[in-house]
Amino acid sequence: MRMRKKKNLLPRMEACSSLLVADPRALRGRWRELLPDARELRVELGCGKGRFTAETAAAEPDVLLIAVEKVPDAMVVAMERAQAAGLHNVFFVDGDAACLPEFFAPGEVDRIYINFCDPWPRSNQKKRRLTHGNFLQLYRRVLPLGGEIHFKSDNDKLFEWSLDEIPRFGFRLSQVTRDLHAGSPVGVMTDYEAKFYQQGVTINRCVATMVPWEAPAEAEGEKA
């Protein structure tokens, strides 16, 4: 579903400009200057309208959260949400997952959130999946050993495919569940997730921890 174009997009973006990092490459290796006492730096890939972003940042004020979003009409809503909440530990970047090594130095990111990404269901689209081996190798370039990927999806086929793909690229799976909110809600939800929960849709979730791994000569995720 395409998001409607937001009215007055540019003025709204300018009103939240203090939260937008215009040149993320200039902060590569220096992100913690934005929050010197931060105990962790985390990245959210595709923040959408920012419910998860704002609530996570509010719950953990000593965590520096960088929300990466390529759709301006979504990002402006997320920025307005964060600004209205008076948050000082969250910043926004116009970009996507492929840019992470350009934005962040090796080992600079402690955790990556991937929430309800596009499943790209056709076989010829699999390289676009954010849990594809090509992306996993990019994440390895910015995470330290022990760094984590937190992955949530309502798409069962994508989740099962990802459970097979992720360990092949040097990540250890844990906290695997196919019904995260069984009984009662668990953790911070995204906007979509809250709707899914109300509709009775089950949510899949896992944590992937980076471990030592030696890439094959031509490592590439090729599971269909």
Predicted features, each with a name:
Residues 48:
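Conserved glycine-rich SAM-binding loop
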Residues 45, 68:
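Conserved beta-strand/loop positions that form the S-adenosyl-L-methionine
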Residues 131-145:
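A short glycine-rich, Lys/Arg-flanked "PGG" loop and its adjoining helix->strand segment in the class I
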